[in-house]
Amino acid sequence: MRGMVAQPKQIEVVHTACQQISPLYPDYATRPIKDGFSWSSALAGCAFERLYPVVFRSVRRPDADLELLREHDDRAYQKALESGGLLRYFKGEANEQRECLSFCLWETKEQAIEAAGSASHRSAAAISAQMYESFVLDRYWLEKVVTERGEKLTFEPIRPA
């Protein structure tokens, strides 16, 4: 299985670096995921081959129950932390057009799938239709290539089977 290196110290370094990933632009929610955030600067020098970002883009309904949404999101996030492998969770705020982008960055695809199968995550997903006018879930491989010229990060979309 390609992915995160299993050395605890390296995982700790990558986890710490991932906390520095932040939006580069106010309109990050409408940009391609690779362009809207500080991936390269935050992950410079970190030892990994491949990570698994899961990106949730949505347009909230004007009458969305934000408290209910927050409760479900918080429970799913807590379960994801407990399951292991979550490197970064970015919870975006809706813009003036109610567009929002959030993402989870995982060590491996398998860890993301395990967390997505939890009851708290399924419960959060179940309220999606009443909270959002539209939403899409995109998955990627975030790969690091090291050459004589330096490091390069690439985002490879994963198409549904």
Model regions: which residues?
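Short S/T/G/P-rich N-terminal loop/turn motif that feeds into the first structured element of a domain
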Residues: 1-95, 140-161
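Generic surface-pattern signal
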Residues: 26, 117, 130-133
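A structure-centric signal for secondary-structure junctions around beta-strands
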Residues: 50, 99-100, 134
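Short, well-ordered beta-strand segments in beta-rich or mixed alpha/beta enzyme
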Residues: 54-58, 89-118
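Compact nucleic-acid interaction/catalytic patches
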Residues: 119-125
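Conserved short beta-strand edge segments in small beta-sheet-based binding/regulatory domains
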Residues: 125-140
